């Protein structure tokens, strides 16, 4: 799923983003990222932009849960375009031929602005690091000024190599760090 997901994110970037303002970033499994960077200080989104996480509406019709508010037209257009692109994508056709479910479209939710966080070391006088396979937690770690330690075999799922994560944490804490956060799901 990660490989196909990355391919589909790249497909979206190539076919749907006609400006430098939009940037898709592949993540782990369904956890991908779409960034909008305003070049003129104005964004199409505001506090009234409303999106719904897909896991909150399982087994429901999506019509009443599509993005609403400022910028919703842009988000809905991307979602509709993804449906068209994914239907024709060879990787999805191979999944269907193998009796597997295809990726049918992107579902955009969880919008917000990156917070401006004071570095943890500056605020509390201690240095830290994080070990995680989850991009959201990596991002929070970076915003806090922590080292983000990449561990081979860390997947963000139950098949994670916990032993390797533990060894990496012990090695890291043996250095200059005051603490380490190891994310286990």
At which residue positions do the language-model features occur?
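Feature captures the catalytic ectodomains and active-site-proximal regions of enzymes
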Residues: 1-185
